[in-house]
């Protein structure tokens, strides 16, 4: 069972290597590891579904509708919260900012560990707080008490999580590096209409990103192929490139979002180049 642990001295009785976690997350002062329903509530909380006012900002997060709001492309956003709401940033694709809510002008930062480390960690969320009081307020707002936050986790997943967290800095930097290379490739491809990624020099947000994002620019790249996006993407989905593999999702407006994994940069670029050059016929896509 995994329980929130506010001091990181232990995470319930799982025996996770918390010292290794803290070695990578030096900016984290207090936080919680959530599983099951409490994790879901933390990742999808908003002012309408929680007990108390929350001002939720999503960073590099693509909504199910496919819309991408301006805030979602600005993980370094530091705008003040309105009223007395608890400022919450849900990090999906902004791994360098895990456990650094203060840098983003937030009280709480929530990271989807499934998005960070792959399918083996689906259903787990990591919550970092500016203070113990902010963490307590957030857990109360999402209705997650110490006992309620418990959920069964397979022992193998537990051990793998401890290892992955100890490698967090390397994992996040690698994925960000791959995303930057992919974005640069896509930005200069004649069959790509536009690319949005804060690490690109020509991106409107690049100047602010370089001032505020010293550990990388996230691992999601949004772009618009000139041809049918669904045929391009479904060809890539046929063969995952690795354990934490890059993938492309298609938005309703025909744009695509690349989620980079841990493959070699040349493999990611090669897969994109092949997909753009030889998209599958739309009728062959499920």
Show where each model-derived region lies.
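PLP-dependent enzyme catalytic core of the Aspartate aminotransferase-like
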Residues: 7-10, 67-68, 73-75, 171, ...
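Conserved small-domain helix->loop->beta segment predominantly found in fold-type I
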Residues: 163-164, 180-254
